[in-house]
Amino acid sequence: KEKVAVLTDGKGGRIPIHDVQISYEKLWTSMTTYMEYPMQWKLFVPELQLDLRVKAAFSAQEFATVLVQGGGFYEGRVTVTGSRQGKAVSGKGFIERKNHTTFTDTEGLLKNVGRFVRQKLAEMYPLEPPSKQWMDKYVLGRNATAGTDLQKVCDTLFKPVRALTDRGGKSWRSLILVSSMNALSKDYVDCSRYIALSELLHVGSLIIDDIQDESVVRRGGKCVHIDYGVATAINAGCGSYFMAASLSGIDDHPPAVQLQLYNLYFDALRAGHAGQGLDIAGLDHLMPHAVESGEVGHLLDSLRSIHIYKTGGAAGTLCRMACVLTGASTEQANALENFGVQVGLAFQIVDDALNLKGFEGDLKEAGEDIRDGKVTYPVIKALGRLTKADREYVWTILQEHTGDRGKVQSVIDKLKSVAAIEDCLVEARNLIEDAWEPVDRTLPDSLSKLMMRAFCSYLTERTY
């Protein structure tokens, strides 16, 4: 891009100068729009012998608006130091910066969120010990002793987790948490440290899930237990649950707030483990009755409860924690918590449907769940509509755990014939719409609220 400096003299004359060198450093990410903005600049104009350092007076000077691409631009006060013609100069100034790291759709927004989440987790989970004081405060606690190999702690507790988080992820839990906090707050809130709650709770469960499921691939790479061993993976995965509470700074709040946050957090953990236990046990014991009778109400409720305990409940808890942290009303808290629960449930329903439709970019082979014999949302929906002969056929193929592409496709075709897959997507949309109505009514309009709404629409239309 062309760079032009304009010198304005004391009489108001303006002289354009094209030999200009500008560089920037120290990026700041807005928790409203997830756009990055430089906080410091170097400006050098040889013709004027002008060499300046420009620094933002403070970071949160974004102007959030739907009138520009990306939802905002940077506009605020700066301090200036440097030299002109060899003499020291200083002063105050004003800067406006548009579209530094913009996006055009919700997918672009989520990429920005994911990039920031990876950066933040890299800070929170360092591959090398930042200092003994940091390790004592956040990891080892008041029983920290001399002789502890701090690098080994990082190697065994942090490095396995980073192997997974550095690959990225959808990061929608963090988007919901952060957007909830800023939608509830009159002033901008830097809630980046609370990302530890949303991400480490999730990634810890992924590591443990992969061990229990004997999986080998996660996020395009080897599962943590494959590269680091089962023992280390279990320790690092479980450790994430406790590091989340430490790194998010729950103990920095007044005792009454701490108590609410800890109660919510451990409630989500307990329910999540109950859900995982139910998932491990499976739903096969309910299938004979559903296949024989075509009655699927209890079977569907059982799967729905697993999805809520494992995913929806955690998302709802994050929304409720946002309400505690911002002093929201009971009406707002109830609306947002239910919204989080339904978003998590809808996410899992869409996942089940996409597994049969196929993921964009061939991220997974269409029908993996059929091959693995999983009783999923589309399967249950179909069992309530298929003939008894077709129900028996579907159940037979599921029990085979077959890799036969023809058989897998035949089951998918039967599910499609009764619109079971599309009906799952419709149900997910309805869940979101119904849950959004009270949120829309109780939360004041803001860009953060709009970000949440945009994600809701994207959730049920996504292709991966």
Show which residues each predicted segment covers.
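Conserved N-terminal diphosphate/IPP-binding helix and adjacent helical/loop segment
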Residues: 105-203, 207, 211-226, 280-298, ...
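Long, repeat-rich segments with strong aromatic
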Residues: 39, 50-53, 340, 347, ...
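All-alpha helical catalytic cores of prenyl diphosphate-utilizing isoprenoid enzymes
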Residues: 141-150, 166-171, 234-235, 251-360
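Alpha-helical phosphate/pyrophosphate-handling elements in metalloenzyme active cores
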Residues: 145-197, 247, 300-343, 380, ...
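Divalent-cation-assisted or electrostatically stabilized phosphate/pyrophosphate-binding catalytic cores
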Residues: 218-239, 289-310, 334-338, 360-385, ...
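Proline-centered turn/helix-capping motifs that create local helix->coil transitions or kinks
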Residues: 129-133, 269-282, 385-392, 403
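Short hairpin/turn module used for nucleic-acid contact or packing/dimerization
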Residues: 57-122, 151, 421-464
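Structured soluble/peripheral alpha/beta segments that form catalytic or ligand/cofactor-binding pockets
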Residues: 1-105
